[in-house]
Amino acid sequence: AGRRVVLIQVTSGDRGSPDRDAAPAEVAATREAEMREAARRLGMAEVVFLRCPDGELMPDLSLREKIVRMIRTHKPDVIVTHDPFRPYALHPDHRAVGLATTDAVYPTARDPLYFPEHLRDGLEPHKTAEIWFFGPEHPDRVVDITDVFDRKIDALRAHASQVGDAEGLEERMRDRARELAEGEPFELGEAFKVVQMRR
């Protein structure tokens, strides 16, 4: 509560459909509409779509520049992103975004000689205090989501093209959140790996 949250969606998921006859542009439009609705349900201030090609992301300088531009535009204290260091089952785009975001935060967004064209656009360097990696293999922070769990499920249900009728979704998510909260003074938890960045 009291925080301004901006969601940056790097791809629009235009290839993320099991329907071989689906038009990628229609898939992307559906995914973007669902993301806007999920963000609305969570009370996010803004959603930005970078519209990079789905399934083609690499943690290269081009992607890093786009993320640095977002950091310098929105000036976040905290960034929440995919944990790129999680082994095995991880979408390659998620891994690329996590790595590019980590490199964008430090040192690139901080130092003015990286992407000097940003200065010409009025975007000043920015130091982000923390990166919170979600879904980590080895979390070091579990946050109490007991009071907001229903909102989380409601937001996930906005992604109807991906979760379908969501049969069993709430039960699976609740079981996982309960596992993560074991030993904590609350019922349901969300796990993160938190990295303090150099200031």
Predicted ranges, named:
Residues 1-74:
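Active-site rim/loop-helix segments in enzyme catalytic domains that contact anionic ligands
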Residues 58-199:
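Metal-dependent de-N-acetylase/amidase catalytic core
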